[in-house]
């Protein structure tokens, strides 16, 4: 893996396995200079890159306190590569050291970075998605419901690009930050132990959806006792009510945090169903 280099010190050609910090200097709100203080994306490239390759930012879960960077990061990125997508695993900052809006800002910056560098990196600026699992699913959902079109006059060229993802993929996501369906550990890590109720509500996907929320694919298991399936169900219903194209698959069996679930013949089908959804939306061939 290459040394960490700020995004604007990278060459125009991406290298598989390189890790790219999202800011040239200290990230906004940084509390130190350790790796955990430096949000970054790690690059995973498909065997063949076209001039307009679709891309996916992958947000591993971990309760907003750890990152499951292998089975919800690298392994997923490799699978996305097999479908022809360039994948970028996001290392976002975590609680309890960091709280909202730091995590959301890191995800938004990743989207802006890919869009602003699309020409140089041979990415399609109109096919940039975000994907997340568990708490990383909450982050991906938050980026899909809280975005802007960029600031044309911004001194930082990355900030001139919009932060809305073009499509969203959620695996057993934390959606709600309110009772009774929230995952309390994720909520505490993101918002602290006594958050403003209105802030918690605003970060609950079931009420944050608008008609501008990107098309969304969701998978979940009915047997998940860590993040109840109601998180996915109520988010899907909110998407449906807003007229947002959405597809949800709830599998009967399967624990939380399974990633690709390669050891489960039934649950592992979710990744194949996702591939069909991506093809149906014209994201991959």
Language model regions located:
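Primarily recognizes the serine-hydrolase "nucleophile elbow" in alpha/beta-hydrolase
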Residues: 109-186, 200-201, 205
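N-terminal cap/lid segment of alpha/beta-hydrolase-fold proteins
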Residues: 8-50
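Short beta-strand element of the alpha/beta-hydrolase
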Residues: 52-61
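Short beta-strand/loop motif that positions the catalytic acidic residue
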Residues: 218-220, 224
